[in-house]
């Protein structure tokens, strides 16, 4: 479990700004579930999704996501993990493969989090950001992610990674603008998923972001 608490180059939760916000969000609460919900809702609602708001820069490192208050789904999951780890709550990274336009190809990975709660075990949460048609919530033990999996070629993957996938980090760091990133969203075909340790999860959960 300690691996899900570690700082890294991307999940730089020891940054002073992250530590300060993590403490502020946790202050009114006592239980890990209450603190996790507060952090989740802050990232979901206060960090603007890059595409929804057509915002630059393209962020990746948790402290940069906090600084600029914008990011793709992946970047938002990086900040949420940092805030939760700063509060000593084990947090990892999960992925889906989703149709970008709900009509089949092209596809993209979609990133979100799993948090370990003593009362419930591992619980998946998606801080992507709500809008009409998307309503991700924190309501354990029920998972309410942004996108259910429903089309051929889509999948939700079982592993909970301790660090973001390298293919995700590389895609974010290579793009200079939100629209450039949109043209090169990371994808892994189901045929190659095992090469990235992406084993499909046996549950049916909608689209990429």
Language-model features, listed with the residues they occupy:
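Secondary-structure boundary elements
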Residues: 1-68
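His-Asp-centered catalytic microenvironments across diverse enzyme cores
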Residues: 9-10, 97-209
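A generic structural micro-environment signature
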Residues: 17, 24, 31, 53, ...
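Residue-level signal for well-ordered alpha-helical scaffold segments within enzymatic catalytic domains
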Residues: 24, 41-45, 82, 86, ...
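Active-site neighborhood of thiol-dependent amide/isopeptide-bond enzymes
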Residues: 50-109
């Amino acid at each position: 479990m300690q691996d899900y608490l570690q700082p890294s180059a991307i999940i730089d939760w020891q940054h002073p700004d992250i530590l300060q916000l993590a403490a502020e969000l946790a202050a009114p609460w006592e239980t890990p579930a209450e603190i996790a919900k507060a952090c989740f809702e802050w990232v979901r609602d206060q960090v603007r999704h890059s595409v929804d708001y057509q915002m630059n820069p393209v962020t990746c490192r948790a402290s940069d996501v906090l600084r600029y208050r914008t990011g793709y789904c992946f970047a938002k999951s990086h900040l949420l993990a940092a805030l939760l780890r700063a509060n000593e709550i084990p947090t990892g990274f999960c992925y889906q493969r989703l149709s970008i336009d709900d009509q089949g190809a092209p596809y993209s990975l979609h990133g979100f989090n799993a948090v370990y709660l003593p009362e419930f075990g591992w619980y998946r949460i998606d801080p992507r950001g709500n809008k009409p048609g998307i309503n991700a919530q924190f309501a354990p033990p029920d998972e309410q992610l942004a996108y259910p999996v429903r089309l051929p070629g889509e999948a939700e993957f079982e592993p909970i990674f301790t660090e973001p996938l390298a293919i995700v980090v590389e895609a974010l760091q290579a793009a200079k603008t939100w629209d450039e990133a949109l043209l090169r969203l990371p994808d892994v075909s189901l045929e190659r998923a095992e090469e990235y340790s992406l084993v499909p999860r046996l549950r049916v959960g909608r689209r990429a972001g």
